[in-house]
C-alpha cells in the first residue's frame, strides 16, 4: 500500500482554499442578505425559546448565539465569523503549522454556524458538501507535524498507524457524491437524460453560464449525446474503481473525474463546488504519483522473482479486463456505432427504466459491502502498522490515536450509509436500524448528507428568467439589470468562479415556478421599494449603475421571459428572448397586495431591532472593514485573494534554499553501488576538499 502523505497535504490545502473562497464570498453578501435591512434578516432565525443555553446550542448549533455578549447583532456576528474564517483559511493555506485539527474544527464550526442562519440562500448541496468535507479535514489533519529530517517511505514503514483511516473516508465521500449524482439522473425519469439530449439544453439553461458555454452549446448534437454517455460512464461505472486494489485503475478513475470537473468549471459558474470535488479526488492519489523524487516516481529496473512477475502479469490482465468491460458495457447499453458516411458516432439508450431499477437494486447493497470490505482492509493495515511500532510508550500513544480515529471512522461510515441508501429505497429499508438511530442523532450537524446534482434538466423549452422593472409613474418602466445573471441580451456571460452570487442563484430557481414558491422574492421587492442600499449592492455593487440610485422606484413589477443563446450568425448578441407572462404584479409601498404577501410569508418585523451601542469598538472595527471592502466587486476580491496566495507561495519558494539532504543521499547511494577499486583510488575519490568549507565533491580523474 503506497503512502499518501503528499495527497493528504494537498487535500488539507485544498479544503483551506475552498473555505477561503466560501467565507470571503459570503462576507461580501451579508448586509444585503442577512443585515437588518436585508432580504432575510438573520436575527429572525435566532430568537430564544426559553430553553437552556446548551440545549439551545445543540438544537441550533451556531456560535452566533454568543454575538450579543460581544455587543453585536446577529448580522455583525456573522460578519465577524466570516472574517475570522477567511483569515484562518488563508493561514492554513499558507502555513504548515496552521494545518492542525483545531484550526479545521474552528473553520467547520464557523461555516456550520453561518449555515444555521443562512436560510434559503445557504441551502445548496455544495454547502452541505463543504461541511462534510470540512469535518473530515479535522480528522485528516495531523496533531503533530512530521519531522522534516524523516523522508516518507512507501509501504508500511513511513506511515503512522492511524493516518490513512480518515483519508479513506474522503474517498468514500467522493464515491457517494459521484455515484449518486449519476444514478439520480436516471431514477428521476427525466426525458432529456434518458434521451441523451440533456447537454443540448444544459449549457444555455444552467444558472450562470460562462462565455465558453455559448460555444459548447453550438457543438454538434451527436457530440452532445456522446458527452452524456461519457457523463454516465464517469459518474456511475467509474466510481467503484476508487476502491480497486490495482493502483493504475485508481489513477485512471482520478483522471476521469478530474476531466469532468475541469470541463464543468470551463462552461459553468458553479462557485467552489467543482473545486471542492477536485480536492476530494486527491484521495485517489499517492506519494509515488506526486513525488518529485525519481526513486519514488518509478521503480528501479532490478531482477524480480517469478511470483512477483506473475502477480504483475495478473494485475495487468485484470486491469485490461476492467477497461474492456467498461468499453463493452458502454457500447452495448448506449448503442454506440460509427456512421462512417456522416462521420459521426450514433448513440441511444438501449435499456428501460425497469431494467435500470432492477440493476440498481442489485448493485446498491453490494456497493455498501464494497465500502465495508475496503474499510476493513484499511483497519487491518492500521492494526499491522501499530504492531510494528517500537517502544512501549510510542505504542501506547499510537494505540490511543488508532482507537479514537478508528472509532470515528467507523461511526462516520455507518451514518453515511443512511443518506447514501436514499438512491434505492429498498436498500434504505434493509439497513441496520442502529445506523438509522445514529444518523438521526447527529443529522442536524450535517456530518453525512445525501447528494444528487442535476437530477432533472430544466428549461427544455427555453431558459426561464425573471426580469425586475421599476417605474416612478406606473407607465414608463425601466429594467433593473443584475451584475451576473442574464438580462441584457448583448452582455456576455461572466466568469465568476469561485464566487457565488447567492441572490442571482435564487433568482434562477424562482423563475422555475410562481413567485409564491419563493417567499423571499416579496422581501426583495419591499427592500428595493424602500431603496435599501445593502440590497441594491447585491444587484449592482457599483450603485452608480443602478437605474434608481437617486430615488427608489415608486412601483415595481417582474416579468418572466424565455432566453436562448443567440445563433453564430448574430452579431453583438449573446442571447435572444421572448416575453412569457407577468411574474409579480405591480406594487408600491403600502399596496394591499404587497402587505398581504408580507404578512402571509411572515416577512413583516413584529418589532424593530434593538439598537446596539455605537461605542462598541468591535462593531466599529467591523463597520470600518466593511467600508473598505464594499466598493470591490466580489469576484475581483476573491481573485485578488487567490492572486495574493499564489504570489506569496511563489516568492517563498524562490527564497527558500533547496535542501541538500536528498542530493547527498542520492550521491551516497551511487557511491555505495559503484564497483570497488583499490583503496588508494577510493580514498582519493572520497577525500573531502579542505578548501570547500565542509562541502565535498569527487575529484576528476586525470
UniProtKB/Swiss-Prot annotation:
GO terms for biological process: protein maturation. The keyword ATP-binding does not apply. Glycans are attached at residue 488. Keywords: Endoplasmic reticulum, Glycoprotein, Membrane, Transmembrane, Transmembrane helix. Its main location: endoplasmic reticulum. InterPro entries: LMF (IPR009613). Residues 660-702 are annotated as: Disordered. GO terms for cellular component: endoplasmic reticulum membrane. It is a multi-pass membrane protein. The chain crosses the membrane at residues 10-30, 75-95, 102-122, 123-143, 164-184, 226-246, 259-279, 316-336, 363-383, 396-416, 628-648. Residues 665-681 have a biased composition (Basic and acidic residues). Residues 682-695 have a biased composition (Polar residues). It holds the Pfam family LMF1_C. It is found in: Endoplasmic reticulum membrane. Belongs to the lipase maturation factor family. PANTHER family: LIPASE MATURATION FACTOR (PTHR14463), LIPASE MATURATION FACTOR 2 (PTHR14463:SF5). Involved in the maturation of specific proteins in the endoplasmic reticulum. May be required for maturation and transport of active lipoprotein lipase (LPL) through the secretory pathway. This is Lipase maturation factor 2. It comes from Rattus norvegicus.
Amino acid at each position: 500500500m503506497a503512502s499518501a502523505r503528499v495527497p493528504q497535504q494537498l487535500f488539507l490545502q485544498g479544503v483551506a482554499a475552498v473555505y477561503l473562497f466560501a467565507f470571503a464570498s459570503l462576507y461580501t453578501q451579508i448586509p444585503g442578505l442577512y443585515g437588518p435591512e436585508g432580504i432575510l434578516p438573520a436575527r429572525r432565525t435566532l430568537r430564544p425559546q426559553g430553553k437552556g443555553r446548551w440545549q439551545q446550542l445543540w438544537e441550533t448549533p451556531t456560535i452566533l448565539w454568543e454575538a450579543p455578549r460581544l455587543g453585536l447583532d446577529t448580522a455583525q456576528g456573522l460578519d465577524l465569523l466570516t472574517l475570522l474564517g477567511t483569515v484562518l483559511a488563508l493561514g492554513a493555506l499558507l502555513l504548515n503549522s496552521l494545518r492542525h485539527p483545531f484550526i479545521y474544527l474552528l473553520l467547520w464550526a464557523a461555516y456550520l454556524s453561518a449555515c444555521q442562519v443562512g436560510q434559503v440562500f445557504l441551502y445548496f448541496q455544495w454547502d452541505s458538501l463543504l461541511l462534510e468535507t470540512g469535518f473530515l479535514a479535522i480528522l485528516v489533519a495531523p496533531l503533530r507535524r512530521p519531522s522534516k529530517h524523516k523522508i516518507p517511505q512507501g509501504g508500511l514503514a513511513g506511515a503512522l498507524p492511524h493516518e490513512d483511516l480518515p483519508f479513506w473516508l474522503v474517498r468514500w465521500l467522493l464515491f457517494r457524491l459521484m455515484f449518486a449524482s449519476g444514478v439520480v439522473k436516471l431514477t428521476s425519469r427525466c426525458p432529456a437524460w434518458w434521451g441523451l439530449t440533456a447537454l443540448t439544453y444544459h449549457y444555455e439553461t444552467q444558472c450562470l453560464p460562462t462565455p465558453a458555454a455559448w460555444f459548447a452549446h453550438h457543438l454538434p448534437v451527436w457530440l452532445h449525446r456522446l458527452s452524456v454517455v461519457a457523463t454516465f460512464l464517469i459518474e456511475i461505472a467509474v466510481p467503484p474503481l476508487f476502491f480497486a486494489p490495482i493502483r493504475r485503475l485508481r489513477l485512471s478513475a482520478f483522471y476521469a473525474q478530474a476531466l469532468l470537473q475541469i470541463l464543468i468549471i470551463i462552461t459553468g459558474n458553479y462557485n467552489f463546488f467543482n473545486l471542492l470535488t477536485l480536492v476530494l479526488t486527491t484521495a485517489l492519489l499517492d506519494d509515488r504519483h506526486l513525488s518529485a523524487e525519481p526513486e519514488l516516481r518509478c521503480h528501479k529496473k532490478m531482477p524480480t522473482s517469478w511470483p512477483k512477475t506473475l502477480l504483475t502479469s495478473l494485475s495487468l490482465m485484470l486491469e485490461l479486463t476492467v477497461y474492456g468491460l467498461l468499453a463493452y458495457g458502454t457500447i452495448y447499453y448506449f448503442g454506440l456505432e460509427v456512421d462512417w458516411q456522416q462521420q459521426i458516432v450514433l448513440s441511444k439508450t438501449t435499456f428501460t427504466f425497469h431494467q435500470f431499477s432492477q440493476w440498481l437494486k442489485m448493485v446498491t447493497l453490494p456497493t455498501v459491502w464494497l465500502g465495508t470490505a475496503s474499510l476493513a482492509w484499511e483497519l487491518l493495515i492500521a492494526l499491522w502498522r501499530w504492531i510494528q511500532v517500537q517502544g512501549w510508550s510510542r505504542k501506547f500513544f499510537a494505540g490511543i490515536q488508532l482507537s479514537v480515529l478508528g472509532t470515528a471512522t467507523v461511526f462516520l461510515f455507518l451514518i453515511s450509509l443512511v443518506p447514501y441508501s436514499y438512491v434505492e429505497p429498498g436498500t434504505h429499508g434493509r439497513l441496520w436500524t442502529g445506523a438509522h438511530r445514529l444518523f438521526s442523532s447527529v443529522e442536524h450537524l450535517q456530518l453525512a448528507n445525501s447528494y444528487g446534482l442535476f437530477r432533472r434538466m430544466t428549461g427544455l423549452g427555453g431558459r426561464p428568467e425573471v426580469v425586475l422593472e421599476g417605474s416612478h409613474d406606473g407607465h414608463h418602466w425601466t429594467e433593473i439589470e443584475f451584475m451576473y445573471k442574464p438580462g441584457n441580451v448583448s452582455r456576455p456571460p461572466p466568469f465568476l468562479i469561485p464566487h457565488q452570487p447567492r441572490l442571482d442563484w435564487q433568482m434562477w430557481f424562482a423563475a422555475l415556478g410562481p413567485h409564491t414558491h419563493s417567499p423571499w422574492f416579496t422581501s426583495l421587492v419591499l427592500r428595493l421599494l424602500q431603496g435599501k442600499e445593502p440590497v441594491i449592492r447585491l444587484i449592482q455593487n457599483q450603485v452608480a449603475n443602478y437605474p434608481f440610485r437617486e430615488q427608489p422606484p415608486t412601483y415595481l413589477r417582474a416579468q418572466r421571459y424565455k432566453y436562448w443563446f443567440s445563433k453564430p450568425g448574430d452579431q453583438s448578441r449573446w442571447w435572444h428572448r421572448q416575453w412569457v407572462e407577468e411574474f409579480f404584479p405591480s406594487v408600491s409601498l403600502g399596496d394591499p397586495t404587497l402587505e398581504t404577501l408580507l404578512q402571509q410569508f411572515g416577512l413583516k418585523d413584529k418589532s424593530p431591532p434593538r439598537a446596539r451601542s455605537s461605542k462598541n469598538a468591535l462593531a466599529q472595527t467591523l463597520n470600518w472593514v466593511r467600508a473598505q471592502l464594499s466598493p470591490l466587486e466580489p469576484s475581483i476580491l476573491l481573485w485578488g485573494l487567490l492572486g495574493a496566495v499564489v504570489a506569496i507561495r511563489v516568492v517563498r519558494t524562490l527564497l527558500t534554499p533547496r535542501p541538500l539532504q536528498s542530493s547527498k543521499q542520492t550521491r551516497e547511494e551511487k557511491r555505495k553501488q559503484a564497483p570497488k577499486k583499490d583503496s588508494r583510488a577510493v580514498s582519493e575519490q572520497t577525500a573531502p576538499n579542505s578548501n570547500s568549507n565542509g562541502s565535498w565533491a569527487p575529484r576528476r580523474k586525470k
